[in-house]
Amino acid sequence: MLLQKSLAIQENAVSHLRNTLRGVRMSVDLQRFIIFAAILIALPVIAMLVPAFRPYIRKNPVITFLLGISSGFPLTLLVATMTFWLAKVGIDTATIGFAVALGIPYTIKFLWAPLVDKLHLPVLTKIFGQRRSWLFFIQALLFVSIWQLGASNPQPGDMGLFAIWALITAFLSATQDIVIDAYRIEILEEEEFAHGTATNQFGYRTGNLIAGAGTIYFASQEGLGLGWATAYGLTSFCIIPAIIGALWAGPGKFVDRFAHVEGMKPKQWLTEAVVNPFREFLTRHGAFLILGFVLLYKVGDAMGQAMLSPMIVDLGFSDLDYISANKLWGFGALIVGSALGAPFILWLGMGRALLISGLLMMFSNVMFMILAATGNSYWMMVAAICTENLTSGIGLTVFATYLSGLSSIAYTATQFALLSSFAGVGRTFMAGPAGIVAENVGWVGFWGFTVLAAIPGMVLFWLLWSKGYVVQSIHQVEAVDEKALKEPVGPLRIFGFLLVVAGLIGLLLSQPLEFANSITATFAAVLVAGGLLAWKGQPARAI
């Protein structure tokens, strides 16, 4: 009898704690929204007082904010919100793990980006132009797929239809990102480029909030209680901001390389659409140094972010402390950092901004090393998390602006998709050993290691800058000497380059896909080796 009472008391205590934490999380989400709204409202006031912030109130940065909302919401629906939903309906953890595969289209989106760059859609392209026609077409399909995803009613043992719609939604969302990124680059003027990139990040975070806390609030019985199907359907209307922005902005500065060619043969079309975007990039001076830098620039920061939560738990902080420090203080610091990134570029120039933001991100990891040595100190945790989020926000805006400036206006979609995929592979694949390092050297040693891990990226940056391959202006393509190499890249070499990229992605995927770990890794290694042989095997020549 006493045992039953004791168990009942424990169960009630656990239930009370869960309800308390749930209430705190919902309260924190509301506070995050208030902080975010306050910063967005404050920006126009600051812009009227500080010239470096003035582009924030121009038309095009406002439009990129709207584009960012539509870009940011699908991935949150597919990862954070969806896994929460599946857990609520009793799907086991192993099955929920399939969500890892939903990130694959975002990683390999450069493979079909040439179609977005060069394939004209009947009727729509003539009316709206290349970018807007693709945007409206993909968004119509995305709207339908999200409704179908919400209506597919996942249950234990009956996940087939749900998984299919989730993969379709992921593919369409990745394609929407290709279009929006290219369109953003093409509508922004030089003097508002960095600010437009920052407002795009603000919009992306807004989409995250709506698809995360908003969708759960719509669906939950503790919120509006509308159910998951209706909640997902309502969230799908987040495509509307991008439609409004695109109609307001016009067609942009898209360059149609096919305009002068009538009756183009399939081989010519494939050469122009698929081969030339990669050839144009690879024939730039310092192309492989640039790719190496893109791959490594944020590795130290990514390793740290991967192991932050385990360290916080290990140091004995409560859930409430971590939620308030990370989701509230940290979120505010991230938004402020993102807003500061654009004036940072304006004040320092692109080269110095990349250098200093990289050093600041290294310093933020030193703060966590101090936290690990200090132990359970709430305000030290707040200071470290705020420093990390502030510097990451600055670095995110600066780095995204740099990648945008590397993209040729003739092949915007393909080249930006390639660069962003490369950056994503670097952040994910290179951060993979983080847990092993932490287990072997402890938390203080681990954070010291993350500082060292950031050094190769900074060394590559120094090489790029010293050779003149990074300049102070935002548009790197126009500013850096773009003369072709003495031996232009031939088609077999481009094929070899794509094989190497595919192999690196395969090595990345071999970590989460445990069911085929060794097979995937072996096949990926073969692709890398084959790509290197193809690159070496053909004498370079023009196509």
Regions found by a protein language model. Give the residues of each.
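Intracellular loop-helix junctions on the cytosolic face of multi-pass helical membrane proteins
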Residues: 7, 20-58, 150-164, 175-176, ...
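Helix-loop boundary and gating motifs at the non-cytosolic
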Residues: 46-103, 288-293, 297, 301-311
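Hydrophobic core of transmembrane alpha-helices in multi-pass small-molecule transporters
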Residues: 69, 145-148, 152, 157-176, ...
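Loop-to-transmembrane helix entry/capping segments in MFS-fold secondary transporters
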Residues: 93, 190-199, 319-320, 409-419
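Helix-to-loop junctions at the C-terminal end of transmembrane segments
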Residues: 110-127, 337-350, 438-439
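C-terminal ends and interior cores of transmembrane alpha-helices
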Residues: 136-155, 360-375
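Intracellular juxtamembrane helix-capping segments at the cytosolic ends
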Residues: 175-188, 394-408
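C-terminal transmembrane helical hairpin of 12-TM major facilitator-type secondary transporters
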Residues: 354-398
